[in-house]
């Protein structure tokens, strides 16, 4: 059976992510209809793949001028169901859009990007909100005003009155890119990993989010020996990896156990491609300020 090393890349604004792993020719054949539920290990891999996709979307749309938003509830206003919390998040998005239009105008409102999750841990966990917000093109003073707006609009209308009352506490903190990239020393998956750590989560987003661009895969760039070297003796050698990607600097190198980063649902025959490690890199264009591990 033919097998080779694949390099798969995504452009995410000033960042690029790269996955390097072994594939076989059978994995290019058309996938049939799913016949049985995925194994626990496959579900974990699917979750991690979804987390990486979301991290790429965050990198493509939000930067240090944006905000990481957390909204919690006072006990009196805690939703009875997850769907009620989702409705609160939808209402919050609608209020933020309307407030940005009123204050900054429709032109600026077109640059408003929101990606907010209703989350909880288990059926008995407390419902709350996490996510990202940014309005491009604002001055420093306008960003401070936008931040205050984000914190004050986590509220609801008082029935029978033209007044509002807060649902609880809402904090809008400046985005720390080291936390987004997972290089702040608090877990390699960073803020996105924290959001995905909740057992139940659902996202509400504005429609103007930029999707990361998937680049053409390279199937002849890497040998098995080179991948093994990169994942072992050069795993923490940024200079070695940067020689492989001119014009980019390494932000993070993650080495995964065999089949952990990429795995087909069909079992692989015994062979080197099922036992070799896999690598996932986050790179940053050199013209931007350095973010080192």
Predicted segments, located by residue:
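Right-hand nucleic-acid polymerase module
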Residues: 1-127, 135-293
């Amino acid at each position: 059976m033919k097998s080779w090393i694949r390099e798969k890349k995504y452009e995410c604004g000033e960042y690029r992510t790269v996955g390097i792993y072994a594939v076989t020719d059978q994995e290019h054949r058309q996938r049939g209809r799913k016949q049985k539920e995925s194994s626990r290990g496959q579900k974990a891999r699917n979750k991690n793949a979804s987390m990486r996709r979301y991290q790429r979307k965050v990198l493509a749309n939000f930067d240090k001028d944006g905000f990481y938003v957390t909204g919690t509830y006072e006990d009196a206003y805690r939703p009875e169901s997850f769907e009620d919390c989702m409705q609160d998040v939808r209402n919050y998005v609608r209020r933020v859009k309307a407030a940005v239009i009123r204050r900054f105008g429709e032109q600026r409102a077109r640059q408003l990007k929101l990606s907010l999750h209703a989350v909880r841990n288990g059926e008995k966990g407390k419902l709350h909100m996490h996510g990202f917000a940014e309005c491009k093109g604002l001055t420093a003073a306008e960003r401070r005003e936008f931040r205050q707006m984000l914190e004050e609009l986590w509220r609801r209308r008082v029935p029978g009155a033209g007044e509002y009352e807060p649902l609880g506490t809402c904090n809008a903190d400046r985005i720390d890119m080291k936390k987004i990239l997972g290089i702040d020393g608090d877990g390699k998956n960073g803020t996105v990993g924290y959001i995905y750590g909740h057992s139940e989560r659902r996202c509400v987003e504005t429609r103007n989010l930029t999707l990361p661009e998937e680049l053409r895969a390279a199937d002849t760039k890497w040998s098995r020996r080179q991948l093994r070297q990169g994942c072992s003796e050069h795993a923490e050698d940024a200079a070695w990896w940067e020689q492989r990607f001119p014009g980019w600097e390494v932000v993070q190198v993650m080495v995964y156990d065999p089949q952990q980063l990429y795995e087909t649902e069909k079992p692989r025959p015994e062979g080197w491609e099922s036992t070799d490690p896999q690598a996932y890199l986050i790179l940053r264009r050199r013209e931007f300020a350095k973010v080192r591990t």
